[in-house]
């Protein structure tokens, strides 16, 4: 039985309007104690507004916000025991790294010796031990982001908020930083809310991902479930690439374009027999030299991407996206036969 106290960060019936524009529309959200949840969605979906409401940087038009059972809806950011890691780092260039990390402790009038110890511990957590006396212009962008993270961790907040913290880093630094963030969040069990527009980042750091659109939650689930079982056409198109076909379902048999195949997990999509939409991820398709006439397709384009060929094929008059093994696919071939793996195929209600 789930303990009600595990519901650590709770938003109830939250609405937020700016003038006549509805930004958040009657939203409910629960984040369990010690978990990391990411808000993901297109620009303007409301994810950053939610983070600002939780932080106390904006007030909801209506609704309530609870942290660890306490109603903080009208509390200032100083009284919410929250820290934010920003995209811009927001470090003071005239201060040493140690003074940057310890700035919040100083504002809380923490004794000097305790400050020094906590600064040292926080820098060790982010692999910057011994950096206390350096200055911002003496360290790299990735190190600056770790200083910003240490500055938040040193305060031991109840809730840690991340506002697109890795957007200014290159691809390799983003990868290492998201690994570090996830490692620290899990080891310290800090309840965390993360905002990003990057699907890979969201999947890498989160216990659960919330996809938003037009101020509402579309689906909240672990990353694997979102990808393999999207609950709407919007989500299917937003979470990675897919090709959507009209099909028919009968038990665990799926038919599309005259091609019938077995989908062992068909029941998990909770659809009745009959017409449906069939979503096919690019990795679910294998091209072979033989098959039934209903499986034949024409290769329209093939682009070499290093670890795979990115192919667009014409299958019964509709585009089919395919990721093909570079050791198997011949870029000179113009015709092939579609074979589907059940992994990477999902079903949706026909709208």
From Swiss-Prot:
Gene Ontology MF terms: ABC-type ferric iron transporter activity; ATP binding; ATP hydrolysis activity
Protein name: Fe(3+) ions import ATP-binding protein FbpC
GO CC annotation, single: ATP-binding cassette (ABC) transporter complex
Keywords of the record: ATP-binding, Cell inner membrane, Cell membrane, Ion transport, Iron, Iron transport, Membrane, Nucleotide-binding, Translocase, Transport
Pfam families registered for this protein in UniProt: ABC_tran, TOBE_2
The gene coding this protein: fbpC
PROSITE patterns, sorted: ABC_TRANSPORTER_1, ABC_TRANSPORTER_2, FBPC
Binding site for ATP: 41-48
Catalysis: reaction(s): Fe(3+)(out) + ATP + H2O = Fe(3+)(in) + ADP + phosphate + H(+)
Subcellular compartments: Cell inner membrane
SMART domains named among the record's database cross-references: AAA
Subunit structure: The complex is composed of two ATP-binding proteins (FbpC), two transmembrane proteins (FbpB) and a solute-binding protein (FbpA).
Enzyme class: translocase
Its membrane topology: Peripheral membrane protein
Residue ranges the record marks as coiled coil: none
Its biological purpose: Part of the ABC transporter complex FbpABC involved in Fe(3+) ions import. Responsible for energy coupling to the transport system.
Homology family: Belongs to the ABC transporter superfamily. Fe(3+) ion importer (TC 3.A.1.10) family.
Family annotation (InterPro entries): AAA+_ATPase, ABC_SmlMolc_Importer, ABC_transporter-like_ATP-bd, ABC_transporter-like_CS, ABC_transpr_FbpC, Mo/tungstate-bd_C_term_dom, P-loop_NTPase, Transp-assoc_OB_typ2
Source organism (scientific name): Mannheimia succiniciproducens (strain KCTC 0769BP / MBEL55E)
Residue ranges of domain ABC transporter in the record: 9-239
Signal peptide: none
Listed EC numbers: 7.2.2.7
């Amino acid at each position: 039985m789930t303990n009600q106290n595990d519901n650590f960060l709770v938003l109830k019936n939250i609405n937020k309007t700016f003038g006549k524009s509805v930004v958040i529309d009657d939203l409910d959200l629960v984040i369990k104690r010690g978990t990391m949840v990411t808000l993901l969605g297109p620009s303007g979906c409301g994810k950053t507004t939610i983070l600002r409401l939780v932080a106390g940087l904006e007030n909801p038009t209506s609704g309530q916000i609870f942290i660890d059972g306490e109603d903080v809806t009208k509390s200032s950011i100083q009284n919410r025991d929250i820290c934010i890691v920003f995209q811009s780092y927001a470090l003071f260039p005239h201060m040493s790294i140690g003074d940057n990390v310890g700035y919040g402790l100083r504002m809380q009038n923490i004794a000097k010796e305790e400050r020094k110890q906590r600064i040292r511990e926080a820098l060790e957590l982010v692999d910057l031990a011994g950096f206390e006396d350096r200055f911002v212009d003496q360290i790299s962008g990735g190190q600056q982001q770790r200083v910003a993270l240490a500055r938040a961790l040193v305060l031991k907040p109840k809730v840690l908020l991340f506002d697109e913290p890795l957007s200014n880093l290159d691809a390799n630094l983003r990868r290492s930083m998201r690994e570090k963030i996830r490692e620290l969040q899990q080891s310290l069990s800090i309840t965390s809310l993360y905002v990003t527009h990057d699907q890979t980042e969201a999947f890498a750091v989160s216990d659960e991902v919330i996809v938003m659109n037009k101020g509402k939650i579309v689906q909240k689930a672990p990353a694997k479930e979102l990808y393999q079982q999207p609950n709407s056409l919007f989500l299917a198109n937003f979470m990675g690439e897919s090709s959507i076909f009209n099909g028919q379902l009968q038990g665990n048999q799926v038919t599309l374009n005259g091609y019938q195949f077995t989908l062992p997990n068909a029941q998990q999509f909770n659809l009745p027999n009959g017409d449906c939409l069939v979503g096919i991820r690019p990795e679910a398709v294998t091209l072979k030299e033989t098959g039934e006439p209903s499986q034949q397709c024409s290769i329209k384009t093939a682009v070499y991407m290093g670890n795979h060929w990115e192919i667009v094929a014409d299958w019964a008059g509709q585009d089919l996206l395919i990721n093909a093994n570079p050791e198997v696919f011949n870029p000179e071939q113009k015709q092939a036969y579609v074979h589907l793996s059940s992994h990477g195929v999902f079903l949706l209600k026909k709208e």
